[in-house]
Curated annotation (Swiss-Prot):
Subcellular location: Periplasm
Gene Ontology BP terms: polyamine transport
Known function: Binds putrescine and agmatine.
Keyword Transmembrane applies: no
Gene3D superfamilies linked: Periplasmic binding protein-like II
Gene Ontology annotations for the cellular component aspect, listed alphabetically: extracellular space; periplasmic space
Keyword Signal: yes
Protein name (database record): Putrescine/agmatine-binding protein
Signal peptide residues on this chain, from the entry's feature table: 1-19
Length: 367
């Protein structure tokens, strides 16, 4: 009888160990959903080397795409990098897991001012961890723009792309823009002297008229290839993020093609935005998710990503590790005067979001 019990115990122990091993094997990956080309390439491999956990990376090129996928649920992702204005909707829908800061020892490195601003969309900083932040402006090929518009080209103004006499001439060398209703419609409203977060349908009609007037001169709407096309000369003006210009500059340096790419935040004002790491409530691997978020909070780790993509981060301890050419670039680490001209992305009522989406659809199709 003892032999039978011993045998049974041995079998059960073996089964238990096998089950535990299988469970651990299933837990040795973490799924990250991030913007296209928005993390230093060596970071996932470095994390795996240190922890044994493989990072499975999926990417998106618009906040609207990511939001739609997350709202459906069961995405299979653990950690997602998401724009601040989308946070309230995800929190309300119960998509996100409230963070246990005891599992994030490197939280202490975060900038208190950045955390304070984030509370507008995440009260108490309960769900989101600052990752990178940036602006939307105009990236352009200095020589090509001057050749077409002269030395006094209004590169410090939205007039460059919203006045037909300018954009019609620039279309000869190519004008492209982000594919983002949230950003472009808000910028158009602000340019017209209207509230960027307007809830008045008539204001959106005016923004639509402005955008449709310049639509024939826009070559394409795409958020993922504008930096490459700017650096190789396929386009000369891009309404895009500051990192668009930075990546184009890096590509030019590597290619040695002599192109001079610059970035401008128009004097009329533009968007400032923040990207944040969140842990999904239905994350398949929450333990590994916490480990990845905390790893990305290390100063040396997030500094590598800033140096790669050209965006500032919300990690105060990382600032000395950010390359000098970024730290001292006034288009990256902004002056108080420039910051005062910027406005944030905001969550709007669903009926207004639908109006904005319809406007953008009409602009893209030119109808």
């Amino acid at each position: 009888m003892k032999k039978v019990c011993a045998l049974a115990l041995s079998i059960l122990t073996t089964i238990g160990a096998t089950a535990a091993d299988s469970a651990w094997a299933a837990q040795t990956s973490v799924h990250l959903y991030n913007w296209y080309d928005f993390i230093a390439p060596e970071t996932p491999k470095a994390f795996q080397k240190e922890t044994g956990t493989r990072v499975v990376l999926d990417t998106f090129d618009s906040a609207e795409t990511a939001q739609g996928k997350l709202m459906v649920g069961r995405s299979g992702y653990d950690v997602v990098v998401i724009t601040s204005n989308i946070l309230p909707g995800l929190i309300k829908a119960g998509v996100l897991q409230e963070l246990d800061r005891d599992r994030l020892p490197h939280w202490k490195n975060l900038d208190a001012d950045i955390l304070g601003k984030l509370q507008a969309n995440d009260p108490g900083n309960r769900y989101a961890v600052p990752y990178l932040w940036g602006t939307t402006g105009i990236a352009y090929d200095v020589d090509k723009v001057r050749k077409l518009l002269g030395p006094d080209a209004p590169v410090d103004s939205w007039d460059l792309v919203f006045k037909e006499e300018n954009i019609s001439r620039l279309s000869q060398c190519g004008v492209a823009t982000l594919d983002s209703s949230t950003e472009l419609v808000s910028i158009a409203l602000n340019y017209l002297g209207l509230p960027h977060n307007s809830q008045n349908p008539e204001d959106y009609q005016k923004a639509q008229e402005l955008l449709l007037k310049v639509r024939p001169y826009i070559r394409y709407f795409d958020s993922s290839r504008v930096d490459t096309d700017l650096s190789n000369g396929n386009v000369c003006v891009v309404v895009g993020w500051q990192g668009t210009a930075y990546m184009a500059q890096v590509n030019n340096e590597q290619a040695g093609n002599g192109r001079h790419i610059a970035y401008s935040i128009p004097r009329e004002g533009s968007l400032v935005w923040a990207e944040n790491m969140v842990l999904l409530k239905d994350a398949p691997h929450p333990q590994q998710g916490y480990a990845l978020i905390d790893y990305l909070l290390r100063p040396e780790v997030i500094a590598r990503t800033s140096n790669y993509v050209g965006y500032p981060n919300g990690n105060q301890a990382a600032l000395p590790l950010v390359e000098r050419k970024l730290r001292e670039n006034p288009a990256v680490y902004l002056s108080k005067e420039t910051m005062a001209t910027l406005f944030p992305l905001e969550t709007l009522p669903l009926k207004v979001e639908r109006i904005r989406t319809r406007v953008w659809s009409r602009v893209k199709t030119g109808s």
